[in-house]
Swiss-Prot record:
Gene Ontology terms for molecular function: GTP binding; GTPase activity
Keywords: Cell cycle, Cell division, Cytoplasm, GTP-binding, Nucleotide-binding, Septation
Protein name according to UniProt: Cell division protein FtsZ
Family the entry assigns: Belongs to the FtsZ family.
GO biological process terms on file: division septum assembly
Subcellular locations according to the entry: Cytoplasm
CC terms in the record's Gene Ontology section: cell division site; cytoplasm
Role played: Essential cell division protein that forms a contractile ring structure (Z ring) at the future cell division site. The regulation of the ring assembly controls the timing and the location of cell division. One of the functions of the FtsZ ring is to recruit other cell division proteins to the septum to produce a new cell wall between the dividing cells. Binds GTP and shows GTPase activity.
Biological source species: Wolbachia pipientis
NCBIfam families the UniProt entry points to: ftsZ (TIGR00065)
Binding site for GTP: G55, T56, G57, E98, R102, D146
InterPro entries listed in its UniProt record: Cell_div_FtsZ, Cell_div_FtsZ_CS, FtsZ/CetZ, FtsZ_C, Tub_FtsZ_C, Tubulin/FtsZ-like_C, Tubulin/FtsZ_2-layer-sand-dom, Tubulin/FtsZ_GTPase_sf
């Protein structure tokens, strides 16, 4: 999957996992942080992907994000000035069947991670049921989620590297994503009549994302990709369809790129940042949580090891 892999916390974990303990994941990342930073220290942009609720993702992701935030990447421009690494978190939340405790641990991990990333995109695994049917295999469901992320992130990078009539660079990306908090990302692809509108509507209604609304977005990045047959009117209609969903004062950055492999089709990718989170849509039934537990919040570094209610009541 990647050219360079780093084993976290060799001394701490002895080659094993974190045992679903965030403190172990945190310690493993801290043990290996110098090696991690050696690989990312000169990066302009960093994507941190993790599954929240377990040990490694919940514990290690915030450590890496914090180190990246404190680092400075030397940008070789006119003044060779130093700029921080633009850090984007792309993480998942547990399935409902994984239990209340794991969901609460995930939420604590998200709170910690959000302190250090510029932009955070959250995908609840439970939302895979929105796009699955009775015949969808377990592996296929995860592949669908991976594809949404891959195409959406590619929409961001394509703006910087793909040729087009309206080209953008990293400075534009940084404007939309730096210090923006929660975000949503979506992509849609269509062909035939009204393909541009259909692609735009698919992009702004990503069923996998956490309950978030584009209405309050502070920054919007729109990338429209098509073949040589993509028309000006199609670009206009797709961009306007996305614009209708956001506040008129939002900072909208737009790009259009060409890809000969897209002949006959149009793809629209949307990244909305600085959005307000709606009610949490986790599958955990809050009515089933005892009142004393519902109002109780564990400090991030004091998440209990045992899952029993008796253990929690003694803390």
């Amino acid at each position: 999957l990647c050219d360079k892999k780093i084993q976290l916390g060799i001394n701490l974990t002895k080659g094993l996992g974190a045992g679903a303990l965030p403190d172990v994941g945190k310690g493993a990342a801290e043990e290996s942080i110098d090696e991690i930073m050696e690989h990312i220290k000169d990066s302009h942009m960093l994507f941190i992907t993790a599954g929240m609720g377990g040990g490694t993702g919940t514990g290690a992701a915030p450590v890496i994000a914090k180190a990246a935030r404190e680092a400075r990447a030397v940008v070789k421009d006119k003044g060779a000035k130093e700029k921080k690494i633009l850090t984007v978190g792309v993480v998942t939340k547990p399935f409902g069947f994984e239990g209340v405790r794991r969901m609460r641990i995930a939420e604590l991990g998200l709170e910690e991670l959000q302190k250090y990333v510029d932009t955070l995109i959250v995908i609840p695994n439970q939302n895979l049921f929105r796009i699955a049917n009775e015949k969808t295999t377990f592996a296929d469901a995860f592949q669908l989620a991976d594809n949404v992320l891959h195409i959406g992130i590619r929409g961001v990078t394509d703006l910087m590297i793909m040729p087009g009539l309206i080209n953008l660079d990293f400075a534009d990306i940084e404007t939309v994503m730096s210090e923006m908090g929660k975000a949503m990302i979506g992509t849609g692809e269509a062909e035939g009549e009204d393909r541009a509108i259909s692609a735009a509507e698919a992009a702004i209604s990503n069923p996998l994302l956490d309950n978030v609304s584009m209405k309050g977005a502070q920054g919007i990045l729109i990338n429209i990709t098509g073949g040589g047959d993509m028309t000006l009117f199609e670009v206009d209609s797709a961009a306007n369809r996305v614009r209708e969903e956001v506040d008129e004062n939002a900072n909208i950055i737009f790009g259009a790129t060409f890809d000969q492999a897209m002949e006959g089709r149009v793809r629209v990718s949307v990244l909305a940042t600085g959005i307000d989170s709606c009610n949490d849509n986790s599958s955990v039934n809050q009515n089933k949580i005892p009142a004393e537990e519902k109002n109780f919040k564990w400090p991030y570094n004091q998440i209990p090891i045992l899952e029993t209610k008796e253990y929690a009541s003694t803390e």
